[in-house]
From Swiss-Prot:
Family: Belongs to the class-II aminoacyl-tRNA synthetase family. Type-1 seryl-tRNA synthetase subfamily.
Protein localization: Cytoplasm
InterPro entries: aa-tRNA-synt_IIb (IPR002314), aa-tRNA-synth_II (IPR006195), aa-tRNA-synth_II/BPL/LPL (IPR045864), Ser-tRNA-ligase_type_1 (IPR002317), Ser-tRNA-synth_1_N (IPR015866), SerRS_1_N_sf (IPR042103), SerRS_core (IPR033729), tRNA-bd_arm (IPR010978)
The species this protein was found in: Kosmotoga olearia (strain ATCC BAA-1733 / DSM 21960 / TBF 19.5.1)
Protein name: Serine--tRNA ligase
Classification lineage: Bacteria, Thermotogati, Thermotogota, Thermotogae, Kosmotogales
Catalytic activity, EC: 6.1.1.11
Statement: the UniProt record of this protein carries the keyword Phosphoprotein: no
SUBUNIT field: Homodimer. The tRNA molecule binds across the dimer.
């Protein structure tokens, strides 16, 4: 949630940011009207209170002089003013709630370093690592390789749960587990993250604090009548665990990692990536989250992104890092790097991680603060990134490490986890 003072003091900056994000600017005008009405109600209430205080003094003087008629008249007037003050107070409170609800729909303000653009076509490639493999045989897509090995089953998954689900078997099921353990070991042992095991069901307030609600409620799986939500990413509980808390300066930065399944309805992705495991309703992910001092958050973004990149480097998978433009930024992000892995089946790079600096956007929604060196309360900055999406990493290994006979070579770093050098 953005700071209402920024909206009030520099509305044209917000308007320009919304325009660059390709967001309807009318929501800003509605918010400014609500803010104006709220401040007018508060100002009028304050004047009425001052008038009531003046009348109270006059009542005391009238009683002292024995003028009971005047005192009674003034008391009636004071009573009427008290009713007006109460009504104005209730009006201001209602307008304040409307303003907060409106603010919940306004996205974060892009950082000045974010390239301006309308869509993914305007994203900027920052760097590349590795070279796509040149096959000397007819390579197969993972949706053919996996079923051919009897280790990837889309048909029975559809029978169980419908489209966009998969069953992994035998060595591919073990490969998924190996990837999870490898990623967690790397991040905890070498990158300094604290591992956390989290609930997969969270309350509405938790989803709202992290920017998932109210805007993206149709994307979430919801349980009735409990009004609980299956997490779309471990970012949600990792960030919201500190909701309504005050952290100490010496506790920053805090770096967390967690493995969880993630659940997404993908309501707006009809017709996209319909084959295989690229876009499914349930997928595994290792998440990275930082809580940092505001002065250090952009340096932290570079470090977090490097931590995610290291997974791909160790696995020997070609990738590139892309800076998202303003029109392609996620709702809560001020700046995002997408890490895209090379997939031969698409003959293209596909997203495997998004690493974002959210600045104080989530901290304001979730009231997450820290005490600075002067003992003043300030909002922390939060960052998040996938380190990595496990299913897409598995797909990248299957496709990039395939052999001419249809088997799959295991990346060297995973051999100790797998106990074999070849799958199939």
């Amino acid at each position: 949630m953005i700071d209402i003072r920024l909206v009030r003091e520099n509305p044209e900056k917000i308007r320009a940011a919304l325009k660059n994000r390709c967001v309807d600017e009318s929501i800003l005008d509605e918010l400014l009207e609500l803010d104006k009405a709220r401040r007018e109600a508060i100002s009028t209430s304050d004047r009425k209170k001052a008038e009531r205080n003046k009348i109270s003094s006059q009542i005391a003087k009238a009683k002292a002089s024995g003028d009971e008629a005047l005192a009674k008249e003034l008391m009636e007037k004071a009573k009427d003013i008290s009713v007006e003050v109460k009504e104005l107070s209730e009006k201001a409170k209602k307008l304040d709630e409307e303003m907060r609800n409106k603010l919940l729909y306004i996205p974060n303000i892009p950082h000045e370093s974010v390239p301006v653009g309308e869509s993914e076509e305007d994203n900027v490639v920052v760097r590349k690592w590795g070279e796509p493999r040149q096959f000397d045989f007819d390579s197969l897509a993972h949706w053919d390789l996996g079923p051919n090995l009897g280790m990837m089953d889309f048909e029975r998954a559809a029978k169980l749960s419908g489209s966009r689900f998969v069953i992994l078997r035998k060595e591919l099921a073990r490969l998924e587990r190996a990837l999870i353990n490898f990623m967690l070991d790397l991040h905890t042992r070498e990158h300094g993250y604290e591992e956390v095991a989290l609930p997969h069901l969270v309350k509405r307030e938790t989803m709202q604090a992290t920017g998932q609600l109210p805007k993206f409620e149709e994307e979430a799986y919801k349980t009735d009548p409990d009004d609980m939500f299956l997490i779309p990413t471990a970012e949600v509980p990792l960030v919201a665990q500190h909701r309504d808390e005050i952290l100490n300066l010496n506790e920053l930065p805090r770096k967390y990692t967690a493995y969880t399944p993630c659940y997404r309805r993908e309501a707006g992705s009809y017709g996209k990536d319909v084959k295989g495991m690229i876009r499914v309703h349930q997928f595994d992910k290792v998440e990275l989250v930082w809580f940092v001092h505001p002065d250090e958050s952009y340096e932290a973004l570079e470090k977090l992104t490097a931590d995610a990149e290291e997974v791909l480097k160790r696995l020997g998978l070609p990738y590139r890092v892309v800076a998202l433009c303003t029109g392609d930024l996620g709702f809560a992000a001020a700046k995002t790097y997408d890490i895209e892995v090379w997939l031969p089946s698409y003959n293209a790079y596909k997203e495997i991680s998004s690493c974002s600096n959210v600045e104080d956007f989530q901290a304001r929604r979730g009231n997450m603060r820290f005490r600075d060196k002067d003992n003043k309360l300030k909002y922390v900055h939060t960052l998040n990134g996938s380190g990595l999406a496990v299913g897409r990493t598995l797909v990248a290994i299957v496709e990039n490490y395939q052999l001419p006979d249809g088997r799959i070579r295991v990346p060297e770093v995973l051999v100790p986890y797998m106990g074999t050098e070849v799958i199939g």
